[in-house]
Amino acid sequence: MTNSTRVRRSVVALIALATAAAACGGSGEEGEDSGGGTAAVSGEPGAVGVGDPYYPEIGNGGYDVEHYSVSLSYDPARPDIVGETGITATASHDLSQFNLDLVALVVDSVEVDGEVAEWSRVDDEVVVTPDSSIGADRTFKTVVEYSGTPTPLEDDLSPVGLGWNRLEDGSTFVLSEPDGARTWFPSNDHPSDKATYDFAVTVPGDLEVAANGRLESNDSDTEGTRIWRWSMDEPMATYLAAVSMGGYEIEEAAGPAGVEIRNFFPPDIAETASYDFARTGEMLAYFTEIFGAYPFEEYGALVVPTALFSALENQTMSLFGEDFVSGDRTSEPVIAHELAHQWFGDNVTPEVWSDIWLNEGFATYAEFLWFDHDDPAFDLDATMVGLTSLELGPIGDPGPDDLFSQAVYIRGALTVHALRLTIGDEAFFDLLKRWNDVYAYSNATTADLIEMAEEISGLELAELFDAWLDAPEFPPLPTPDSGT
């Protein structure tokens, strides 16, 4: 995501949620029975939340999701959706009950492995009690049918909410970082549980649907609607999942190394947007050279017909507002930033939100790497020295209120540059590629980065990272031959 400070809402205390979840065995109303009685099961309930230091109530324990199959029906004349999500997961222990994250939408039914399951709603959780316990290491499939009007989460510092957003013309888009996926499909809404996806979206025949991954088909039916099918075959964090619907012009081009580039532009600004985004292929080629092979089959941009004042690196389909279309390519840094996130954030995703600098620091530094590559007049070292004049607090543990603060981006990029100066270019660019290879399609932490950088360089780097990530004031940039 491009720089945009965000403030989150406090939520229900974990202990109250856990107590309520254990007590409920009913339908969509709290405390009401579903009519099936109380299922006799052994095992233990999955944890309520994954224990993320910033968002302890988000995500759920007891299982690991392998695949989401999301089906939606939408008519722009109405704000509501009809959905069905299949969730294939593996139990991490003998599981008697588990939770899914879902906001506002009405649950119509829940099945586990084809059998009707009891369920209840406890605030923004769906608590599922299968007919019999699910053994440890067993793979099981939960199917949730749901409907209603998606409600985005409030965000005081953004013109739009988090999650599902609907514009006045009926078009929709998704901007979910960090916890908005639960506004439109039931999920384990935490980046530590990545999964593959497929989407089947039914809309009127005159609408286009953009989503993650590979476009499989967009077949018309006899009722005047079209079903758009997309597949995301590489694991993806929930906050990067996106389905957007509206009237768009689709621009397709062949990118480097066989990557398909597919952009979705509003018709009235499509020509201008095409010019502004025309260098995506060049950026893709350069980043592939320095970061390693592009980790997905396709890439593109979705430009929505409203101002967003931020952008988001939805996996394979980055999101931009129309305010990033100007006709003079002034948004090139943001375009480079979101593309770089496909490696740093999408391919390799932080295990916990406190390590957000791993996303934003590297993506911001990638902007400077692009200009250093593309513009002979650009002075990278002078630019980085100039940035050290800014007052930027610690970023190793920024707190949820400063998750997307300027410090995370700029001090993060300075940390990356300090690392480069310390270990030298050969080790640094080896690190960029190895990071994306070793942790491909998975999660990593700051500790993982330090360990890998030390292994490659042969240097002890804990002191360097402590100073740049955690000290109240960061030190001067090292010189290339100064060690730390």
Model-derived features: positions:
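Secretory targeting and sorting signals
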Residues: 2-29
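Acidic/His-enriched low-complexity segments
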Residues: 24-294, 421-423, 463, 467
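Second-shell loop/turn segments in exported
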Residues: 128-131, 186, 266-275, 325, ...
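Catalytic zinc-binding patch centered on the HExxH motif and its immediate surroundings
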Residues: 163, 273, 290, 294-295, ...
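Non-catalytic accessory/interaction domains
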Residues: 175, 203, 208, 251, ...
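Zinc-dependent metallopeptidase catalytic helix centered on the HExxH motif
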Residues: 192, 317-380
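Acidic/His/Gly-enriched intrinsically disordered linker/tail segments
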Residues: 233, 354-423, 433, 439, ...
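Short, solvent-exposed turn/loop segments enriched in Gly/Ser/Thr/Pro and often Arg
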Residues: 295-313, 356-362, 378, 382-384
